[in-house]
Amino acid sequence: MDSPGQGEIARDSQGRPILDRYGRPVRVRPQPRQTPPTPRTPPVNETRVYQPRQTPPRQTPPRQTPPRQMPPRQTPPRQVPPQQQYQQPGQIGQVRPQPPVIAGDGGRRRKAISFKPRGCLGTIAGVLAVGLVLVFVVTLWADSKLNRVDATPATQVANTAGTNWLLVGSDSRQGLSDEDIERLGTGGDIGVGRTDTIMVLHMPRTGEPTLLSIPRDSYVNVPGWGMDKANAAFTVGGPELLTQTVEEATGLRIDHYAEIGMGGLANMVDAVGGVEMCPAEPMYDPLANLDIQAGCQEFDGAAALGYVRTRATALGDLDRVVRQREFFSALLSTATSPGTLLNPFRTFPMISNAVGTFTVGEGDHVWHLARLALAMRGGIVTETVPIASFADYDVGNVAIWDEAGAEALFSSMR
């Protein structure tokens, strides 16, 4: 008998049930009931007027449900057993400690970000190497540009303590153009140069250096020429005779020699951007092309050269040697300051101008000059040979030393 809802059993033409391959009767799927279609109302071609609802709005009271309080979740820290590491033979019982595991991270170990300084150190090493090579090349180039002269006399005094430099400022016009001569007020060519500045820098093994000024009109013995002004030795015998004259007059052995001319001094001042000086009184000297007021001010090359050359003051040459010491100390302080050395636009012009205008002894080099500059920058004691009187001789007006005071000063430097 057919079950309701499952369809009738299919039969063949003889009325026998049709079986599937498993021996089960095959049922005929019932046909779905056909629903008559709903008649469709044709659209009306008209516009309806919107009628708002006249129902008053529903008044809903606010919900007075208190906020739900959720207790904090108490999660115990996860206990992770220590990881056993492979042990080499002979290391039984030694367990390598493991880094702690942070609770809540699911036991996953985060890879720490490690800073590897190899690249940074390599860059720094490369920059330092390039800098050292550059310094080495510039040093050799500067040393090759120095003018050298034989300033060591054949006979020298006995060796004295420390190191002594003979520093000379000459009024040579060599290398100056007509425009430079007019700008600097140096006058025309005078032939063999004379020394406007004679100083001895004594650098002891310990303690501060001493910068000793020797007035150029000092009345001293010039070997082979007799008594004369100190600067006459340079005129008649050059650096070698001047060195010998200073050694015999002071008893100090001269180890190094350095000389700079007018043009070189002015160019160095301009290269470092000027030097600040503080004259105590106004100064006017048309022969030195100088016209400055009292007070602190910045000198360019022309003003600086006139400042160290002029003798238009009350004490003449004695005032000048004091100004020369002050100026050279200020110049070296400016030239060796970080603002100059770290500025390539000042350092290279300064070196270029300095090496071309400096004259040094045969055995002197640019590194000796660098040590000289650093010694003077660190603080120095300034002295002038004591003068007893002035007198007129056949060589002109000269300065007579105070023999006792001069000897005491020289002895302190030997």
UniProtKB/Swiss-Prot annotation:
SUPFAM superfamilies: beta-sandwich domain of Sec23/24 (SSF81995)
Effect of disrupting the coding gene: Deletion mutant does not show any growth-related or morphological phenotype under the tested conditions.
Periplasmic side: 142-414
Ranges in coiled-coil conformation: none
A GO CC term attached to the entry: plasma membrane
Keywords for the protein's UniProt record, in alphabetical order: Cell inner membrane, Cell membrane, Cell wall biogenesis/degradation, Membrane, Transmembrane, Transmembrane helix
Record's subcellular location: Cell inner membrane
Residue stretches spanning the membrane: 121-141
Cytoplasmic side: 1-120
A Pfam family it matches: LytR_cpsA_psr
Main localization (coarse): membrane
GO BP term, pick one: cell wall organization
Biased composition (Basic and acidic residues): 9-23
Residues covered by region (Disordered): 1-108
Family matches, as InterPro entries: LytR/CpsA/Psr_CW_biosynth (IPR050922), LytR_CpsA_psr (IPR004474)
Superkingdom in the source lineage: Bacteria
Bias kind Pro residues: ranges: 33-42, 54-80
Ranges annotated as biased composition (Low complexity): 43-53
Membrane topology: Single-pass membrane protein
Induction remark: Transcriptionally regulated by IpsA.
Family affiliation: Belongs to the LytR/CpsA/Psr (LCP) family.
NCBIfam families in the record: lytR_cpsA_psr (TIGR00350)
Name of the protein this chain belongs to: Probable cell wall biosynthesis protein LcpB
Organism: Corynebacterium glutamicum (strain ATCC 13032 / DSM 20300 / JCM 1318 / BCRC 11384 / CCUG 27702 / LMG 3730 / NBRC 12168 / NCIMB 10025 / NRRL B-2784 / 534)
Underlying gene: lcpB
